[in-house]
Amino acid sequence: MEWIQAAILGIVQGLTEFLPISSSAHIFIVGKLMGLGDPGAAFTAVSQLGTEAAVIVFFWRDIVRIIKHWGLSIAGKIPRNDPDARMGWLVVAGSIPIIVVGLFFQNAIEVTFRNLWIVATTLIVFGVILAVADAVGKHERKLEELTVKHGILYGLAQCLALIPGVSRSGGTITAGLLMGYTREAAARYSFLLAIPAVLGSGFYELFKIVAKHENAGDTFNLGQTALATVIAFVVGYLIIGWFLKFISHNSYRGFVWYRIALGLVVFVLLGFGVIPATLS
């Protein structure tokens, strides 16, 4: 991998992480079009630290308040039904499914699903599901109305993001819409819920690479990955603000059509042998 290619992948990561179009799918596809080997699950996980840092900076006031009140509720100094403390508990509850599924299906995640036929299929299928959710959802519930049950359902939907092409934000936002939440509420909880999962995955992959030299992929380079991570942070920060404003006045229809079109393009490229199906 050249430095310019790492920079391009960083831009792609930042542009796509928070949109319901799957950042991992775009990293795979763009990497293949540039003639790269598989950057690996490690590259994706570590570069996502940049976009997750963007979430933390963008929502830092909310996050600090949530953590503070959550800690006070644990100490018994404020009731657990305090709005911010409650959100902290909801993020914890929603994170349980991804921890369990990630631990038990790590090999399948890192090997079996890294195939462009799967990516193209999930882009289209989950694009259609997002369209249905956006059309039939009531768009009435606010973030303050989130329940533990719904938080766990969000968490189960987040597990689908372990399959390349589904999209972490796409899966959780779809779940939120189906449960009747507004587009903005669904997106905000999706972003907050992703923080523990992405940080945990990213730092774990980084530890394996630095300490154990595992799972580095064909083209992994720590310096280049660091560059991609920084670029992903800057671009991702800009995208968050734009996305939240956009969905407050628009539907997800444009993202749905984009997913379907991209999936079809990948099928065509695979069918004509322009790019290989396997990511190795």
From Swiss-Prot:
Highest taxon above the source species: Bacteria
Enzyme class, spelled out: hydrolase
GO terms under biological process: cell wall organization; peptidoglycan biosynthetic process; regulation of cell shape; response to antibiotic
UniProt KW Membrane keyword: yes
Molecular function terms, GO-annotated: undecaprenyl-diphosphatase activity
Mode of membrane association: Multi-pass membrane protein
A Gene Ontology cellular-component term: plasma membrane
Keywords on record: Antibiotic resistance, Cell membrane, Cell shape, Cell wall biogenesis/degradation, Hydrolase, Membrane, Peptidoglycan synthesis, Transmembrane, Transmembrane helix
EC number(s) recorded for this UniProt protein: 3.6.1.27
Ranges that cross the membrane: 1-21, 40-60, 89-109, 116-136, 146-166, 191-211, 227-247, 260-280
Catalyzed reaction equations: di-trans,octa-cis-undecaprenyl diphosphate + H2O = di-trans,octa-cis-undecaprenyl phosphate + phosphate + H(+)
Pfam families: BacA (PF02673)
Subcellular location: Cell membrane
Claim: Transferase is one of the keywords in the record: no
Family annotation (InterPro entries): UppP (IPR003824)
Biological function: Catalyzes the dephosphorylation of undecaprenyl diphosphate (UPP). Confers resistance to bacitracin.
PANTHER family: UNDECAPRENYL-DIPHOSPHATASE
Similarity comment: Belongs to the UppP family.
Miscellaneous notes: Bacitracin is thought to be involved in the inhibition of peptidoglycan synthesis by sequestering undecaprenyl diphosphate, thereby reducing the pool of lipid carrier available.
Protein name: Undecaprenyl-diphosphatase
Gene it is expressed from: uppP
